[in-house]
Structure formats: structure tokens, C-alpha cells
Amino acid sequence: NIVFGLELKGIPSAERLSQGRQYLRMVGLERFETRYPHELSGGMKQRVAIARALVNHPKALLMDEPFGALDAQTRNIMQSELLRIWEEEKKTVIFVTHSVDEAIYLADTIVIMSARPGRIKDVIPIPIQRPRNRTSSEVNLIRDRILCDLRSEILTC
């Protein structure tokens, strides 16, 4: 499943398997190489999706609500895993989320979109060093600004 894109590119079988195993190791699933999708948890499926994307060596990785269906604990683990993988791969990641906390934890820059018509409402740089403390005063200030931006379409902050 992970190496299907490489097969379409005509990459030889041995090289495909080698690269697939490399990315399975990166996402911590090397022990599950022979498992079928229905045998994997939600978090494992998300890791497979990340490996499948990265094995194709994209310039940027687009992730649209990838952790939205996960429970809170698995979501937090996957956020940390994504940051670890990002540190290794140094790829641009465009991450769409409705979770303010997730955006602050993961992003270097947050782009807030308005409601209909969708347009850029605000661009907020996140100058907080990693690892980030999700409850720090710096995070709280940014969270307040974002929530105010989001509410301002309805109310004045």
C-alpha cells in the first residue's frame, strides 16, 4: 500500500520495498508490515498515510484534518510524531485543522480563513520554541488572539 506510488513511477521492486520499509520504520510501524488496513488502529492508519505520502518525496505535504477522527490521547501522540518526522524530513507541511490548540502546537505560521467567502483573514506567526508547552502564557496569548479572530465574524472582541 505504501509503495504503490513508487510502482506507478516504475521504481524496481527491491528499491520500492527498501524505501517502503525505511518509511515504515520512520513512522514506527515496521512490525506491522504485513498487516491489512482493517487490522490497524486509527492512529496506525494515519501513520501509514504519512509514510505513503513521504515515500514519494513530495516538496510539500498537504494534510487536511488528518487527526480529526482520533481520540484526544492518540491525537496528541500523532501531533508529536508529526513534529518528529518533520524534523527528520524538513518538508513543508500545509496542515488544515479546526483545532486552535493543534494549530498552535504544530505551526510556525497560522493562516486564519474567514467564513463564506473563504479568504485569508489573518496570518499569525508562532514565535514559540519547540517543544511547546500547551498551557504556557505565550500559548494562551496566541490562543486568545485566534479565538478573538474567529469570533469577530459574529461579535466584536
Segments the model singles out, each with a brief description of its role:
Residues 115-145:
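Conserved beta-strand-loop-alpha-helix hinge in the C-terminal portion
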Residues 61-64:
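Catalytic Walker B motif of ABC-type/P-loop ATPase nucleotide-binding domains
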